[in-house]
């Protein structure tokens, strides 16, 4: 039986309904029950989905965890080539240039060359769970 301690999912504020439902399913599956192994849940942002929902407070993406990806930015962009049919030309938010821009912008906001951000949905410390 798989017992993950960390789970990554779409943000609840993604405009894509499948992303929103995925988030809801993950949060439901990872209910904080005594037998759960999940101690950390992070949601991530997707250009052309997360920021397009609107600015209702409960749906707003707020980056509160930053991971330095400076050494891996080129690998990230190369990995996106597997989804080439999903990518668009500039000025579309989901262009290679804008994915790179966002990583550099997120990094610059915390003194790094590039960063991936997450919203911490849950963070539990200790062994009692």
Please provide the spans of the model-predicted regions:
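Metal-dependent de-N-acetylase/amidase catalytic core
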Residues: 1-129
């Amino acid at each position: 039986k798989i017992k993950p301690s960390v789970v990554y999912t779409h943000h609840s504020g993604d405009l894509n309904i499948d992303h929103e439902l995925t988030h809801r399913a993950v949060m439901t599956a990872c209910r904080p029950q005594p037998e759960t192994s999940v101690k950390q849940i992070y949601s991530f942002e997707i250009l052309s989905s997360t920021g397009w929902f609107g600015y209702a407070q409960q749906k707003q993406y707020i980056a509160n965890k930053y991971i330095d990806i400076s050494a891996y930015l080129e690998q990230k962009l190369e990995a996106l080539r597997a989804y080439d049919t999903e990518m668009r030309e500039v000025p579309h938010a989901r262009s290679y240039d804008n994915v790179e821009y966002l990583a550099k912008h997120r990094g610059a906001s915390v003194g790094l060359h590039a960063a991936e951000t997450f919203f911490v949905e849950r963070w539990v410390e200790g062994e009692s769970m």
